[in-house]
Amino acid sequence: IQAYFAATHEKDITLSPEAEQVAWKEKAKVTEAEIKQIKAAMRGKKGDELAAYEKQLEEATNKLPAPLPALYSVENDFKRATPIHLLERGEYTKPKDKVGARPLGVLLPDGAPERESLPENPRTKLAEWIVTPDNPLTARVMANRIWYWYFGRGIVATPNDFGKMGLRPTNPELLDWLANQFVAGGWQMKPMHRLLLHSSTWKQAYNSPAFEANMAKDPENKLLWHSSRRRLEAEEMRDSMLAVAGRLNLKMGGPSIMVPVDKELTSLLYNPKQWTIAADASEHNRRSLYLIAKRNLRLPMMDAFDAPDMQISCARRESSTHAPQALELTNGDFASAMAEAFAARLTKEAGTDPKRLTERAWQLATGRSPNAKEAALAAQYLSGNRPLREFALAVLNLNSFAYVE
């Protein structure tokens, strides 16, 4: 596979006029020379003298001109093609036989020949092989992933492994049919989303008339005879708490955001100054999509609720249950701040009447009115003149808030 990319090299296309590019290069050249001079002067320095040079280096680095707008692009340069070899035990310092461009041998018939030279458009040829009708694996894998996104479990429960070490499909005929639909639809995902959302399987409720009988036959719900109950994922949990508290910033686009964290976490970084908190506090309440993700600094909320750690590919998220989750939702800094904001919102929108407070809290957090038992418990709690913040925190810990049925 790597041989298909052996001749590929970056060639970004700068969008600025030539005169602007020349001016940018001149300014960058002067600043880079200054940085080089400071680095040479600070060698061997210690203490206050070193700190002074570090400050100069930071100031000089900040003077570097911002990158010019450009389009990321690549080109094929066969004269610079990198030779690809088999590696002994995967070590690049121990190359063995040279190999040509060819799909993975495990996916090809026995005796399939190597390609001696690169094709004219190697990446295009690889893409064509990936979607050829002779390779049904791609469509099956993609259809299975789309199914997993909606139902929490793929028809093949190991989305990254369709081989002998993976689990067998629970409904192979359905998987083949979905794969054929995907290909027939021009490999477009929107028709697949529409197909699944209009299906009777998607429209099922959690409670089934034959719940006990079906549970005896299929307790893991592999055949999806009812909808599966699932907990909100880490990002969904955070965004939902922000929305209920009235703090969610729906701003679109822009760079990733660094939010405030404990100093104990930033001190673990090689350079703690890398964690630059956004100056505008409203940016801290952006959707979790915009939170910066660092492998060596895990946000407590994300870590507790099984967000991927980005060390390895994550085809399927697990949903664990452990004590730190309860601690995060009751004593965590983020949960406490959201409870305060939620209580302030309830006071503003529902006043001090216990019945109105309860109704508004349930509507915001669960999308429904409280049942008789819930209303009675809430009324009993609020009649004790306890802090409204504690009531708001309890509502944010309801199963009806944290789980989707």
List each language-model region with its residue ranges:
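Hydrophobic/basic alpha-helical segments
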Residues: 292-298
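Primarily short, surface-exposed interaction patches in extracytoplasmic proteins
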Residues: 28-283, 302, 308-320, 330-389, ...
